[in-house]
Structure formats: C-alpha cells, structure tokens
C-alpha cells in the first residue's frame, strides 16, 4: 500500500476585504468586469461571454448588467462593502454596469473614467464602406 503524502505549506486563508476597485472595460463587442483589492490583486472577474452571451449579444447593456452582478456577488461574499469604479471604453454597457454594481449592494465611493484618449497618436483604421 502506498504511503499517504502529508501536505506541506500553509492553506490560503479567506481574507476580509472591506474596500476594492471595480474595473469595467466596456467595448462595442463585450464588457469585462474585474474586481481587485486596493493593491491590484484580482478577487473576481466576469464578462458577458462568460455569462453565456454569444456573438453580438455580448455588447448589449443587459449582458453588461449580468456580468457586473456575477462579479460583485462573489466579492460581497468575501466581505467587500465599498469600491471605487474605474471605467474604460466606449461600449453601451458602461452605465448599466455601474447601476448593477450599485443595485447589488456595493457602496460606490468614486467613479473614474480611465478611457485612453490619444493626443493625436497612431493613425486610426480606415472608415468602413458597407
């Protein structure tokens, strides 16, 4: 009979995280919600695609709402009460994601738009001709 292997090392303890940062990346095709602690370590994430939406439905406001609710539900179980929101991108799920975060019971202390805007940097892609 094989010897039983003893586990060496310390198990990760569940930390109580009272304050965090919610990063919402809203593109035209998808919405990704990532929740970190104040140091930047990821606690939970969700996206419209991970919630079961496919194709063009991923870019809808309802998909963004569902993704935000799923991500927030996990961190509320870990004890988070307040969060700052960093929102980036031009997508249609921006406002809906913020409303969903607030409705899920997470207190919002700050909303900051961190959408990168070039100071006339790279040449944009040519316009579509449909």
UniProtKB/Swiss-Prot annotation:
- Keyword Chloroplast assigned to the entry: answer is yes
The answer to whether keyword Ribonucleoprotein applies is yes
Q: Which UniProt keywords apply?
A: Chloroplast, Plastid, Ribonucleoprotein, Ribosomal protein, RNA-binding, rRNA-binding
GO BP: any one term: translation
What would be one Gene Ontology cellular-component term for the protein?
Answer: chloroplast
Protein origin, superkingdom: Eukaryota
Q: Where in the cell is it found?
A: Plastid, Chloroplast
Q: Which Pfam families match?
A: Ribosomal_S11
Spell out the subunit comment. Answer: Part of the 30S ribosomal subunit.
Family membership: Belongs to the universal ribosomal protein uS11 family.
NCBIfam families for the chain: PRK05309.1, uS11_bact
HAMAP family, A to Z: Ribosomal_uS11
Name-wise, this protein is Small ribosomal subunit protein uS11c
Q: What is the lineage of its organism?
A: Eukaryota, Viridiplantae, Streptophyta, Mesostigmatophyceae, Mesostigmatales
């Amino acid at each position: 009979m094989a010897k039983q292997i003893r586990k060496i090392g310390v198990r990760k303890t569940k930390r109580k995280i009272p304050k965090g940062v919610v990063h919402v990346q809203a593109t035209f095709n998808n919405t990704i919600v990532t929740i970190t602690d104040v140091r930047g370590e990821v606690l939970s994430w969700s996206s419209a695609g991970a919630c079961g939406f496919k194709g063009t439905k991923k870019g809808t406001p309802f998909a963004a709402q569902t993704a935000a609710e799923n991500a927030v539900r996990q961190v509320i179980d870990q004890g988070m009460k307040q969060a700052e929101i960093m929102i980036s991108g031009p997508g249609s799920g921006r406002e809906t994601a913020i409303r969903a975060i607030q409705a899920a019971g997470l207190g919002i202390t700050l909303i900051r738009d961190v959408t990168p805007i070039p100071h006339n940097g790279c040449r944009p892609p040519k316009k579509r001709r449909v």
